[in-house]
Amino acid sequence: MKYSDKHNIDPDLIAAVIWQESGGNPDAYSRSGAVGLMQVMPRDGLAAEFQCKNGPCFAGRPTIADLQDPEFNIKYGIKMLKRLYDHYGDYRSALRAYGPMDVGWSYADKILNIYSNYGD
């Protein structure tokens, strides 16, 4: 995976995120409006209704149309995960922040468990 190499993230970790998020289905959509393999929230559609302290939560994100392209979706998801890793300093915390707001550490732990089983 050229994008995981560029951001120095193990491709198996990205595969684990994709498996947890979408089961590998590039056409996956969540009830909350997340799109594609890495289930990225776009700036339009259902996600446009989410309001944060300073306005729409996902205003700076790509559109649904952008995220429907599997390669773009992976590239953007990796970039998001890398930013979170740089901010938190470890993958467990970065994955917790990447996942849905109401799931907490269990989301990160599920992905790390999937990741630990890759290559076995």
Task: For the regions a language model picked out, list residue spans one by one.
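Catalytic glycan-binding domains that act on GlcNAc-containing polysaccharides
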Residues: 1-120
